[in-house]
């Protein structure tokens, strides 16, 4: 596997009868505009010129609290909004024919959700909060109409679509060509990088997702996930206390992953 493919895999590993999403949580006017939001360098305005960010501020965004376990939208629901995570963690998933849930991604502050609905006007997955969270709701039709006459915002739309393609490609690489230790190492390194970008510790964090959800995302059984965590502890790469993770040798975890891949 090439170094470029490895880098993409680590940086992008970012997951019944249908019902309408639970919209009981209120949507309130957005108090913090994109131009002065502390997440602007990670979220929608990233790379935008000042004038384009001002245009974003003119759009009618809403803010909404989402409780742990609450589903934001379900697979098959009509597409209206894209969502920016302000705080908390979400998982995206889809239902397999045999009734099992397949986790397809995890999202944290500054990341966008709901783009899977752009192509066909309906969401291809469900998204659920893993902890109490807050989001910005962005009416896609309004956003797209403003972007249609603005080259800077058109570039943003293209970047967002490209990011989704890269994420899907990286997941295929992860599932198709890596063993269990490589998959879990890539997952932990990715979380570490994303948390560091948000000002948190790169070496010590609490997993918001269960081991079963990690296994579903990585294509591993719960037992294999547990065994692999134990193997990393024995190699003194990690300390694990339930969902609390401390990477004791970040360079070693990275080197071990790169050595296995090559």
Language model features by range: what are they?
Residues 148-221:
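Polybasic "coupling" helices that flank or enter modular domains
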Residues 193-262:
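Phosphate-/nucleic-acid-contacting segments
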Residues 3-68, 112, 117-120:
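Cyclic nucleotide-binding regulatory module and flanking cytosolic helices
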Residues 87, 141-142, 212, 251:
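Alpha-helix/helix-capping structural signal
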Residues 63, 106, 137, 208, ...:
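Short aromatic/basic micro-patch
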Residues 103-166, 170:
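Cyclic-nucleotide recognition modules
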Residues 55, 70-132:
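Cyclic nucleotide-binding regulatory domains
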